[in-house]
């Protein structure tokens, strides 16, 4: 009987200890604190995203690592400065800043342009109505647009206007839309963006588009204040369009603007005499255009690649601090992809577009390095947030326990020296050792709580991951 009574008392005591222990834990740390720490630990395993950071997509794990279906190791070929890689602009949508979209034919720009007007989380979303080609993208509280693109302002500087046309046209166009009072304000910021595509598949896509009757005759090709003459820019076909042309016919025309289109549209044509081919040799002309296109691409606020939709979305969001509503999707079922092209034909297309091939390799390298740089920057920020949460938790625990983590000794007046017995001296020495051990344990705990503070971040190139 006594045994059962003792057992009952012990069980009741244990239950009371557990009950009061739970109350103490809830008092020390609120539920949100523990959730934050748990989520921080979990996010570090899923790509070092801090609590509250939104994953770009609903998939588990890293949504970027294998979007293109290949897990090859990316090795940077070009050396870029931190200024080239760091892309985070202070875009004031409520101010006067404008995003200008340079739309190159057959690069997926139509899809991206629709994302800009229909898929961005905004305080004042663009107003798009069925049957209308353009959307109204006004700033909050103003009747002033923040976006210059096909689907917002239309082809206001010409059909598929290039870099040369846009940089000379957009500022004056925006000023003409404003009142006289607003024209006196300081000049606004124009953030140019574009999308590039693999040159071979872009070229095939343009051929198929022209084969179906597209001409782009409305393009102005304005340069240095004038239009090109027919001698400078002759046509590849005599009729109204080039519908039904074969790939061979498309390739043999020496005046075909599809050749190296991306390089030409991103370069400053004024540097080479616009479309006057007699100013310099062809190789010298294209070499200058390539360097100009590379320079403009580096200085653009943002550019994306059709082959990397999710990374394109991520870099745009990272650059402008804007978020898309729905994730981008990688669609490979284009008309160009359905064309069966012999290896020899592909080689000829690459030769015809050798400057675009060089530009795309350069752009791809810069794009992936920017992505890697942004991801590591995001991880550093998430790590700092975890450190701050850990410090807050430590401070709350110490505040409740009423300790500082370190022993504090106050000087006291020593008593007169008296002869001490060996036993008393030995006991005093043991007390001193226990005090030192306790202080050391407190310092170890302090160091453990701040172990992340002393870590050194390796250069991002030394830790290149499997991105492509």
From Swiss-Prot:
Record function comment: 6-O-sulfation enzyme which catalyzes the transfer of sulfate from 3'-phosphoadenosine 5'-phosphosulfate (PAPS) to position 6 of the N-sulfoglucosamine residue (GlcNS) of heparan sulfate. Required for muscle development and angiogenesis.
One Pfam family this sequence matches: Sulfotransfer_2
UniProt name for this protein: Heparan-sulfate 6-O-sulfotransferase 2
Glycan attachment positions: 79, 276, 332
InterPro entries: Heparan_SO4-6-sulfoTrfase (IPR010635), P-loop_NTPase (IPR027417), Sulfotransferase (IPR005331)
Keywords attached to this entry: Angiogenesis, Developmental protein, Differentiation, Glycoprotein, Membrane, Myogenesis, Signal-anchor, Transferase, Transmembrane, Transmembrane helix
Keyword Nucleotide-binding: no
Principal location listed in the UniProt entry: membrane
Gene3D superfamilies assigned to the protein according to its UniProt record, in alphabetical order: P-loop containing nucleotide triphosphate hydrolases
Tissues where the protein occurs: Expressed ubiquitously during gastrulation. During early somitogenesis, strong expression in head and presumptive brain. During mid-somitogenesis, strong expression in eye, hindbrain and somitic boundaries and weak expression in tail bud. During late somitogenesis, strong expression in eye, hindbrain, branchial arch primordia, spinal cord and ventral medial somites.
Domain of life: Eukaryota
Gene Ontology molecular function: heparan sulfate 6-sulfotransferase activity
Record note on disruption phenotype: Morpholino knockdown results in defects in the branching morphogenesis of the caudal vein and defects in somite specification with impaired muscle differentiation.
One of the record's GO cellular component terms: membrane
Lumenal face of the membrane: 31-468
Transmembrane annotation, as ranges: 10-30
Binding site for substrate: 133-134, 150, 155, 160, 209, 216
Catalytic reaction(s) noted: alpha-D-glucosaminyl-[heparan sulfate](n) + 3'-phosphoadenylyl sulfate = 6-sulfo-alpha-D-glucosaminyl-[heparan sulfate](n) + adenosine 3',5'-bisphosphate + H(+)
Record topology, Cytoplasmic segments: 1-9
PANTHER family xref list: HEPARAN SULFATE 6-O-SULFOTRANSFERASE 3, HEPARAN-SULFATE 6-O-SULFOTRANSFERASE 2
Compartments where located: Membrane
Membrane topology: Single-pass type II membrane protein
Biased composition (Basic and acidic residues): 425-437
GO biological process: branching involved in blood vessel morphogenesis; cell differentiation; embryonic eye morphogenesis; muscle organ development
Keyword Transferase appears in the UniProt entry: yes
Gene name for this UniProt entry: hs6st2
EC number(s) given by UniProt: 2.8.2.-
């Amino acid at each position: 009987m006594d045994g059962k009574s003792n057992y009952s008392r012990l069980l009741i005591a244990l239950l009371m200890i557990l009950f009061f222990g739970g109350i103490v834990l809830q008092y020390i740390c609120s539920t949100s604190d523990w959730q934050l720490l748990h989520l921080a630990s979990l996010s570090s395993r899923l790509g070092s995203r801090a609590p509250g950071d939104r994953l770009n997509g609903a998939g588990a794990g890293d949504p970027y690592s294998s979007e293109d279906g290949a897990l090859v190791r990316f090795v940077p070929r070009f050396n870029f400065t931190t200024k080239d890689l760091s892309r985070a602009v202070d875009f004031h949508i409520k101010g006067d800043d404008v995003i200008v979209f340079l739309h190159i034919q057959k690069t997926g720009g139509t899809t991206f342009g629709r994302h800009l007007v229909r898929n961005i989380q905004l305080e004042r979303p663009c107003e798009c109505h069925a049957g209308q080609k353009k959307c109204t993208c006004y700033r909050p509280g103003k009747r002033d647009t923040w976006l210059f693109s096909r689907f917002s302002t239309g082809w206001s500087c010409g059909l598929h206007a290039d870099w040369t046309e846009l940089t000379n046209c957009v500022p004056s166009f925006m000023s003409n839309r404003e009142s006289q009072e607003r024209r006196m304000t300081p000049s606004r910021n124009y953030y140019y963006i574009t999308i590039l595509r693999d040159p071979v598949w872009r070229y095939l896509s343009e051929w198929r588009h022209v084969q179906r009757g597209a001409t782009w005759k409305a393009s102005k090709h304005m340069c240095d204040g004038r239009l090109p003459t027919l001698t400078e820019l002759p046509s590849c076909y005599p009729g109204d369009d080039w519908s039904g042309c074969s790939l061979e016919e498309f390739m043999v025309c020496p005046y075909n603007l599809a050749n190296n289109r991306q390089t030409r549209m991103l370069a400053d044509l004024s540097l080479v005499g616009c479309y006057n081919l007699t100013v310099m040799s062809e190789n010298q002309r294209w070499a200058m255009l390539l360097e100009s296109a590379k320079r403009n691409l580096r200085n653009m606020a943002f550019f994306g690649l059709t082959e990397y939709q999710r990374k394109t979305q991520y870099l745009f969001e990272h650059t402008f601090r804007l978020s898309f509503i729905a994730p981008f999707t990688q669609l490979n079922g284009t008309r160009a992809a359905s064309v069966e092209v012999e290896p020899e034909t592909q080689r000829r297309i690459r030769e015809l577009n050798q400057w675009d091939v060089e530009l795309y390799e350069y752009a791809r390298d810069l794009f992936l390095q920017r992505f890697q740089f942004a991801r590591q920057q995001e991880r550093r920020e998430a790590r700092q947030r975890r450190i701050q949460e850990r410090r807050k938790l430590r401070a709350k625990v110490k505040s409740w326990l009423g300790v500082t983590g370190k022993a504090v000794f106050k000087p006291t007046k020593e008593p007169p020296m008296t002869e001490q017995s060996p036993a008393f001296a030995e006991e005093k020495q043991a007390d001193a050792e226990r005090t030192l051990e306790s202080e050391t344990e407190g310092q170890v705990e302090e160091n453990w709580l701040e172990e992340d503070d002393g870590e050194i971040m390796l250069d991002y190139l030394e830790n290149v991951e499997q991105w492509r």
